[in-house]
């Protein structure tokens, strides 16, 4: 899950300021100010609704900060298209790009975007799209509902159908366009309340 992955990154960083700042914007803001003053290279990973809450409370301008959003809104806020979300975050943090992670609890692998909203997969992960009305019509290029094959899932199901709408490009990269209407709220970030 996202929480497990980030916890592992925190432990591996061994930096004294690495940690979870769940709903503690005051401490996070103080930590970021300190790291900025020390010119410490910093990665801030947050769920979309949490990062929005943070910058709407008070913007924090740090052009050298690397910000990675993940997890979507999970029903906690109005769904935004990725471009709108990223524009708000860019302005709120004073950065030129917002990185993104696309993954889910059922998968061992993730796809990453380096600021342009276009996700790339590792070689053992493939994304297909199906027709919204007929999930048996799969294709490797075009728009539709995203389906993921993750060969890293050795001892579990290595293929899933999501309720995410997307578009796959000729090179296998893809964009997430939103959710299927009336789809379930889901995600590991809902585990923490």
Language-model segments: which ranges?
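Phosphate-binding loop of NTP-binding sites
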Residues: 1
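Active-site glycine/GP-rich loop and adjacent strand/helix microenvironment
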Residues: 4-193
